[in-house]
Amino acid sequence: MSLEGFAELRAQMEAFQGRVHGHLGQQRHAMEQLLAAHRQEVEKLRLRTGAVQQQLARLAGEEQELRQNISSLQERTQHTTAQRDAYAAQRQKLAAERTQLEHDRAELHAMLARKQAELQRQREAIKRQHMRDNPEVRVYEQLLGLYVRASRPDSLEFAFRNVSEADARAECSFTLDLGADGYRVAAAQPPLPLERLRDLERDLGSSGDLPAFLKAIRAALVTAMAGQADA
């Protein structure tokens, strides 16, 4: 490649990185807003759950007191049947209220679980959009012979072509898992040292710089391929 061609490629890469960085920033801002809204909803649900717990504790105390009163009433013949019936009716009312509160608590727990699952799905969708749906990725595909496909709902598969002057069919590849705990590189071909993979994952997770990550892992894969050829 001539110096002019290299300068043009470098300018394209820098411009692409800037646009991707801006896009990732926008997506990160959207995720922060989503997380803030989710935290508010979760906090409301937790407050409601706490109130239900307090009411259940109060009911438990009242039920215990009623049991003692009923037991005492049964032992004392001077108490009237009307008073005993009143205690029994109050106990039934408290039991019905307890049943309703337990039902409400179960619904709140289910609602919280659905909210958390929805948030996780949205986070994974945004991650996939960052790396696959961005139209700028097509430019990067042409520059580095990159091919991207969604092998599973929670992962993306990357393949680099044009990695060997001696073998036009040679390619390097890896799979990037998009889990809730962050990015995880899997199934690298050729294999890379575990420590190197963890460094790449940490860099991507902390910076969000996809172009820099792709350049770094491509260089590592090409070096590993060259080492295999020399062995």
From Swiss-Prot:
GO (cellular component) term, any one: Ndc80 complex
Function: Acts as a component of the essential kinetochore-associated NDC80 complex, which is required for chromosome segregation and spindle checkpoint activity.
Subcellular location(s) per record: Nucleus; Chromosome, Centromere, Kinetochore
GO BP terms in the entry: cell division; chromosome segregation
Assembly behavior: Component of the NDC80 complex, which consists of NDC80, NUF2, SPC24 and SPC25.
Coiled coil: 23-132
UniProt keyword annotations, A-Z: Cell cycle, Cell division, Centromere, Chromosome, Coiled coil, Kinetochore, Mitosis, Nucleus
Keyword Nucleus set for record: yes
Protein name: Probable kinetochore protein SPC25
Record-stated family: Belongs to the SPC25 family.
TM spans (from-to): none
Main location: nucleus
The organism's place on the tree of life at top rank: Eukaryota
InterPro entries recorded: Spc25, Spc25_C
